[in-house]
Amino acid sequence: MLEHTTKVRVRYGETDQMGYMYYGNYAEFFEVGRVEMLRSQGMTYSSMEASGIMMPVMEMKCKYLKPARYDEEISIRVILDKMPGVKIHFRYELYNEQDELIHLAETLLVFVSMKTTRPCLPPQEFIDKMTPFFQ
């Protein structure tokens, strides 16, 4: 299993009239968490794209427990429970500044060849870096 936590502050433009983070902006926080998890392992989306691989989101599931509020620092905990293959499943737990769980989510992404636009295995470098977490 691989886990990583990133912190992001809710900006004014991400909130609605009530001062809560607008529900559609949570997906961007998930992306920040995924990107920083990969970066923590020495990988980037841009390096995968340079190798001809994209990672589009296929599915997203969210459960809003409490609102994220303007100017709050949110901890985004990202969890990979199993070794990725053609698909990669991320789980997210968002915590407010009081360390209260405020949001649960999951995304399913697929590795896609930019040349064929068909699903494919991740690059070997990705597999090599992920394998130790799932042995």
Which stretches of residues belong to each language-model region?
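Terminal targeting signals and extreme-terminal segments of soluble enzymes
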Residues: 1-75, 83-135
